[in-house]
Amino acid sequence: MDQIAFNELAGWVTGAGLIGRSEGELMTGFCRRVTEAGIPLARALVILDTLHPIYEGRALLWRSDMPETGEVREYGRTNEGEAAENWRRSVFFHLLQSGETMMRRRLAAGDPVDFLSFRQARDEGMTDYLALIHPFAAEGVIGEMDCVYSSWASDATDGFDDADVLALQRLAPFLNLAVKSAALARMAGTLAETYLGRDAGRKVERCGAPRATAPGYRF
C-alpha cells in the first residue's frame, strides 16, 4: 500500500466515524478498501467490550468472500465456565497479560500454532495471521471497555508481506477509534431510552438537550 492509498483509507474511516456510520458499516467499508489497496486480506475481526447487563461485548467480522455483508455478533460474559477457559487460552488474553501489542504467525511457513485461533485459521486455509491489541489509557477506560482487539488473516499463497503488516498496524487505530466512537454513540442511545423511555430518549438523540448559555457567550 502506497502513502496515497494509506492517506485515502485513513481519511475515509475517520470521516465515516465522524458522520456516524455504524460499527458494521465501518468494518465492511474499511476491509473492502484494504483489499482494493492490494493487501490480501481474507478474514478480519474486531472486538470491543460494551456496557450492557447481559452482553460483554461485540465482535465485528468480515470475510473476503462476502465483502459487502460484514457480521456483528454480541457475546456473553467470559468470566466463568467454559467461556472463561476459552478466553484464558486465547491469543488476545496472552497479549493482554504479556503487555505485547502484536503477534503474527505465518501459518503456511510452519510457525507454531500455539493458540486455538491460529489452528482454526490454518484449518480454514489461512496462510498468515496477525493479532493486535490497542489498550486505552486509564482516562479512556469506560467500565470494562478498556481496549480494542483485532485480527487479520490472509489466504494468499505467501500471506502478508512486511509492508502489508506495517500498513495494518498503522491503519488499525483509525478503525478502532471510529468503532469506539460508534459504540459509545450506540450505548448513549440505549442509556437514554432506558432512563428516559423510548420516545423521550429518541427525541434527545435527534434533537439534543438545550444548549447552555453564559453571560457574553453563546454555545
Task: Indicate residue ranges for each PLM-predicted region.
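Signal-transmission linkers at sensory-effector interfaces
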Residues: 1-19, 25
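Helix-loop-beta substructure at the N-terminus of cytosolic sensory domains
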Residues: 19-70
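Regulatory sensory and allosteric helical modules in signal-transduction proteins
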Residues: 66-130
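Regulatory loop-to-helix N-cap segments in sensory/regulatory domains
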Residues: 136-169
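Signal-transmission/dimerization alpha-helices at domain junctions
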Residues: 154-158, 167-186
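Juxtacatalytic helix/coil linker segments
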Residues: 185-219
